[in-house]
């Protein structure tokens, strides 16, 4: 996930935060020699887990690999992987173009697959007193419409919540099991009606922790900020639940990654909130994008995500209640919600 807030870097970091350095066997793409040196220098200076790498040895191996594209690629991949905990990446110019195009197509609603339909059929029917919203992965496409894309997606998620909020809901399920990452900010703003517990003012819902002071994620009635900087804002106050502060059950799984894990952490520590399912992917760290001299880019992992209480280690997030199957996870979440005082007797 993203710390650097310049729009192009932000867009690229959100887009590629879960990708690893890889190349087709037929054509190995590599940074230029100058860019390779810059890449290693940047990793040694700024990467979150830079102390895990013997940098003189890594440079010696890179030098010995000259003339062998496969070995060069493998050395760079190892340097990035070890110093980022598996969350960083090198992106060629061509790959940035192709992935931006692919991501643009991927923002359309996905068709329901046979496996999705089977899982839905096996899940228990929800009690009508419980609302549900699925916050899936979402990446913005680099360009001048980045802010608009974030606003539109956040507004869409808030509308899903609003349309279910008849006044009879005594609890909600936030399903993050399929959230493989992307841009966390529209996710947090989209679920703000459930995330926020106050009507006015700012709420700190998490942070990025670096060697310096933490950078807090702040939810306002209309948007999201990183520290004092506005990341995305709807322009007017977003939707507010008819019964604010109701119990929320959070569903997680091994596909919940990166921005998805940021969303889990934002909800963790919220009053009347409990998580169910399986541990997350384990990349709850934040990325920035650093352009290199040849036009390619380094997705650089620089900080750890933490919840509103300062808890977080960059590793897998374990749910409060471990459940394995989709049906068992939904059933456990529903049982807990219905046992809460907000639902009792309603």
Model-derived regions: residue spans:
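N-terminal secretory signal peptides that target proteins for export/translocation
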Residues: 1-7
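Hydrophobic alpha-helical segments, especially transmembrane helices
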Residues: 7-9, 37
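A broad, low-specificity signal marking well-ordered, structured residues that form hydrophobic/aromatic
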Residues: 9, 130-131, 273, 298
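Bacterial N-terminal signal peptides
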Residues: 11-20
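Terminal targeting/pro-maturation regions of precursor/exported proteins
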Residues: 26-173, 177-178, 345-346
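C-terminal "post-core" interaction segments
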Residues: 29-47, 136-139, 167, 176-346
